């Protein structure tokens, strides 16, 4: 492919090796995946990728900045700021569809990045609220529904079912249980956006109202 993208098969081998080693050393009784919120996976009706998972630092979406700005929802609808490159997932989709006119028709379902790995572990496709609500332009948090952008892009019916991070996607697939030594009844949770994951302990443990001053995703 001509665009910058993730080597998901190498990541998959790394993940399986990590699960195998962790199971051997400590044991695993549940799995949840957390990632950044600026990538998305397009799957066909067999659950396979129909396009590479775009690196959010790829500048391709900047090529259609004016056109995209004309269709993206207002901040008052989504709470998403307008960000450069592929940091708005909606811009990624718009750019990818403009580059490949057949891509939308090939796409059966769209999943957020943590849930792509959850899908590979379980075979179940979903999106989660924290990832879809993370500056994607695709989520209306006030109405708790897909934003108007999805309809404009013609993907409302393609975005996989949106569930909570604590919901269970399913159990690991038998072949993964065999490869890793993990119990085949091990649940895989939906997964969560990384910055929301770092906020969650405060939400759970802090009584009453509070403020968190965060550096964002990365801390050095």
Language-model regions, residue ranges each:
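N-terminal glycine/serine-rich phosphate-binding loop of ATP-dependent small-molecule kinases
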Residues: 1-52, 106, 161, 177-190
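Short, hydrophobic/amphipathic alpha-helical packing segments
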Residues: 12-20, 90-93, 193-200
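Conserved FAD-binding subdomain of flavin-dependent enzymes
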Residues: 22, 60, 70-74
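Residue-level signal for inorganic ion chemistry
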Residues: 31, 58, 96
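Residues that line or immediately flank small-molecule/substrate-binding pockets and catalytic motifs
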Residues: 35, 57, 166
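Glycine-rich phosphate-binding loop of actin/hexokinase-like ATP-binding domains
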Residues: 40-45, 49-68, 107, 111-146, ...
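Gly/Ser/Thr-rich active-site cleft segment
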Residues: 76-193
């Amino acid at each position: 492919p001509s665009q910058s993208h993730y080597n998901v098969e190498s990541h998959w081998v790394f993940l399986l090796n990590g699960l195998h080693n962790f199971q051997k050393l400590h044991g695993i009784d549940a799995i949840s995946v957390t990632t950044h919120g600026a990538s998305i996976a397009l799957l066909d009706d067999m659950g396979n990728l129909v396009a590479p998972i775009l690196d959010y630092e790829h500048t391709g979406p900047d090529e259609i900045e004016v056109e995209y700005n004309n269709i993206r929802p207002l901040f008052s609808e989504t709470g998403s700021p307008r960000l450069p490159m592929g940091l708005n997932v909606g811009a990624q989709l718009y750019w990818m569809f403009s580059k490949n006119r057949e891509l939308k028709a090939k796409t059966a379902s769209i999943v957020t990045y943590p849930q792509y790995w959850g899908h590979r572990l379980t075979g179940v496709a979903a999106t989660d609220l924290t990832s879809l609500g993370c500056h994607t332009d695709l989520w209306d948090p006030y109405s708790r529904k897909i934003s108007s952008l999805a309809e404009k892009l013609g993907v409302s019916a393609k975005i996989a079912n949106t569930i909570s991070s604590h919901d269970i996607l399913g159990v690991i697939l038998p072949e993964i249980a065999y490869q890793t030594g993990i119990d085949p009844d091990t649940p895989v949770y939906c997964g969560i956006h990384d910055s929301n994951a770092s906020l969650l302990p405060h939400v759970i443990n802090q009584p009453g109202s509070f403020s968190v001053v965060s550096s964002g995703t990365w801390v050095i």
